[in-house]
Structures are given as C-alpha cells and as structure tokens.
Amino acid sequence: SNDTTADDAGEETTIIVFAAKSLNQVMEELITKFQETHPNVNVQGSYDSSGTLLTQIEEGAACDVFFSAAVKQMDQLDETDGLVVDGTRHNVVNNQVCLVTYKESNTEVTSLEDLNKASSIALADGSVPVGKYTRQALVNAGILEKADDVSTIPTATVSEALGGVEINECANVGAVTSAVAEGSNEVGTVYYSDTYGLEDRLEILQVIPYDLTGDVIYPVAQVQNPEAEELESTTAKEFIDFLITDDAKTIFRKYYFDTDVEN
C-alpha cells in the first residue's frame, strides 16, 4: 500500500469526517489507528444524527467523508443530490438494534412482543435511523400497521399500538441511551454498539433479529468538497479505504459492530 502524499511531502492536511452519532466512540479509536500510519493527517470528526449531517452537507457545509448510520441518507446524498464521489461508496458495518432496560429495573418486558408492559419507552423519532428500524421491526412483528414509509409513523401512533404507553420521543440514539441508562425511561431501543461501556448500567432484553429490522447497514463515501485541495481529497479516499481493512474491522467488533458485510 502506498503511503499518503501527505507524509512523502511532510505536508499536513486536515480531512473533515461527518459520522453518525452512534459511531462517535469507535471513530475516535479508528482515527488514532489511522494516524499511526498518517502522522501528518488531522481527522476532524463531527458527530450527529445521519439526517442532521445530511442536511448540513446539502446546505453547503465543508465535508470530505460522510459515514451514515443508514442507507437512506446516503442514497439521498448520492442519487438525489449527486454529491458522492463515484466509486468511493462502501458498506462498512451492520448494527443490531437492541431492546434495553436499566440494571435492576425489574421490568416485565422481555421483547418487542410484550413492549406494551413497559411503564415508559424512550424511542427515537422516525427520521432518526434507529427510530425507523424500530418502527420497521414493530410493523414486521405485527404490532404496528404497515406504512409506505415507516419513518413517517408518528410517535403517538406507536404509543396507541402499544395500548397508550408513555413514549419519550428522542432526537438521536444517544438521547435514548441516556434516558434508559439514567432510569428516566424503563426501556428503549438502541444499537448494540451503544451499549459499549455501559454494560454495568444497561441490560439487553432482546437483540432484535435482522429479519425484523432489515439490515442496519452503515455506508461511507467521499463527499464532493469543492473547497478541498488535492491532498485533502486523496487523504479522504485513503481514510475510507482504511475503514474496510482488517485492522479497522477488529476495532469495529470491539465496539459490538457486525463486520460481516459485503464492502
């Protein structure tokens, strides 16, 4: 593999990476690993929900790499907006959605099937990928009625389908994780990876199978950044290539991501 031009010239460069909130912890370790072989590269990570990041890119925010928690946002950037650099898009990891509670909650809930027994549920809004996947799972489990686009199913409709249970609508998966870990809500749905580091506070009630949620693919791609110089652009490509190496996969697995995907 050829080292970056950045290192040959001793030139420093910065690449801007927009990554889904659920990638925050693993990305910090991945960036550190990448910098071992690219000491002159500064990787600037910005983390938020995939939908928010997509909007920022569409509104002209400078960005070199978009790492989304869902295919939907990447398709929008790629096919609708035409802002993805050809040939740079890869599926990186899969992530399982989990139903969680806090330790010693004594909840009666065991799975989605008896979710209506919860005193309260933390649930991400349908525009947030984990909220969309949860709605899809509830539709496939026969709890929610089908919709053309499950992400448009309002929180109130989910509550009604569960017999009027109180739902705390969250703006991103981090808010769901906090609400349950703190005991503000009895149960919630988060990614398996969100339970990393919270093993002593969260209990997984159910790892929701992919046949209910569908695949939870995280795609990455280089974003057309007119402000980027050539060095920044080639380095962005190298960072994307790094994300599908065995070294990177080992790190992803440590944070409970599923690397068994076609890159």
Q: Where are the regions that the model predicts?
A:
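Ligand-binding clamshell of periplasmic/extracellular solute-binding protein-like
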Residues: 45-55, 62-78
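Sec-dependent N-terminal signal peptides of Gram-positive bacterial secreted proteins and lipoproteins
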Residues: 1-2
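Acidic, polar ligand-binding/catalytic clefts
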Residues: 72-85, 90
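Active-site charged/polar residues at nucleotide-handling catalytic sites that mediate phosphoryl
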Residues: 60-61, 183
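Exported/periplasmic ABC-transporter solute-binding proteins
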Residues: 6-32, 36, 42, 51, ...
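Short glycine-biased active-site loop of nucleotidyltransferases that positions the nucleotide triphosphate
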Residues: 58-59, 90
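Multi-pass membrane catalytic core of lipid/isoprenoid biosynthesis enzymes
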Residues: 98
